[in-house]
């Protein structure tokens, strides 16, 4: 059953006023009486709409600088009153039924994001009346429609037109779910903010105690259900943060291809975040969340060609990310050369789509340009808990590098070392990356011992006929023994960049000197698990 409920009276009180005038006009044109408060009421009146101030309706003025506006029985009785059950008591107290509540809340998140936000500023942006009305209307969704998102305005009017001014129960229920999600997210933001302040509260809350609140409340919005998860017996869905600003897999738009799988999303994220490290035209090819080929060049076609040469076998069925617009020459080279699951770039030239359309299974994504990378949190689920840390946005400055070997690196060796250091940050530990002339030539990933990662990187380079002699090597963490240096020297590595910090650093440096290898310490580790 549709269980239609006509909309005769609506209360509008919004902080985000986008589209509210047009929505109110549409309601008024359909015979809906408008109640409103404060700034919303003034805006509607200035737009020549007939609107009744809530204070006139209740007979009680707004007070305490607007802190008390809608907390009144005539408001909440009108919202919570059960039609056909509470009619007599409502009439006795002159309470008019309110059939629709249109509310969004004080901008708490935007306020506390400002660098100069004080506790007093935050407190004044904690909405009280708004969430109370939202919850009241959502609770009584059997009779009342609650609207918290301006994106719903258009379809609400369309449904009213299709149902003689009424809304169906399914629509009211869907709106109620959105409302409870809205208030839950709002309260979570407030709890997280206060949880970061110096405990216990002694009046001095000017300095936060740290990045991590006492209770962590997370809110993500489901973007899509997935056919399955990492494996076919696992159910899965993809959730994203709200109000994202940085270009990412979460904000990307898909231009063609099948729906992204769980593994597609994880691998595309790895590829995109790696390619963001480079200023020059760059290409990153990823397989199973590990880069298998990375290169920079004068353009992305040259970068792709070099990245592919690192490991053509692993590149099959991989993910390709670029940091420049995808052009027709590069797109044609990809589809002529290999099977690829996903291509992601900031943009795609309009002439590229007909070329890619010949391979409809290729998922093509555009993510937009990016500037500075946004600080944030990374999460890792463990059984019974959640590990939380800052995103690894660290990248050592050249001025902080320390040459610890007798021989200093040449200009080209330093360039190669810095290149493969950027790549090593995105390779699963233990990570070893060989690079030469702006391209990776061997990557050893995920081994339990560092020396075996070094050996694997050398084997991969040899398998593809790539010249290791004179290349640079990056290690994501320090060498616990000299064996990794000996393995690198055996294949011709001439420069090594690594964090340093082992109790056997002297032994490791001695090994480098014995082999004539230049060694650079970064003082920064990049474990990735």
UniProtKB/Swiss-Prot annotation:
The keyword 4Fe-4S does not apply. GO terms for molecular function: IMP cyclohydrolase activity; phosphoribosylaminoimidazolecarboxamide formyltransferase activity. It catalyses: (6R)-10-formyltetrahydrofolate + 5-amino-1-(5-phospho-beta-D-ribosyl)imidazole-4-carboxamide = 5-formamido-1-(5-phospho-D-ribosyl)imidazole-4-carboxamide + (6S)-5,6,7,8-tetrahydrofolate; IMP + H2O = 5-formamido-1-(5-phospho-D-ribosyl)imidazole-4-carboxamide. Its EC number is 2.1.2.3, 3.5.4.10. Residues 2-148 form the MGS-like domain. Belongs to the PurH family. PANTHER family: BIFUNCTIONAL PURINE BIOSYNTHESIS PROTEIN ATIC, BIFUNCTIONAL PURINE BIOSYNTHESIS PROTEIN PURH. The IMP cyclohydrolase activity resides in the N-terminal region. This is Bifunctional purine biosynthesis protein PurH. It comes from Photorhabdus laumondii subsp. laumondii (strain DSM 15139 / CIP 105565 / TT01). The lineage of its organism: Bacteria, Pseudomonadati, Pseudomonadota, Gammaproteobacteria, Enterobacterales.
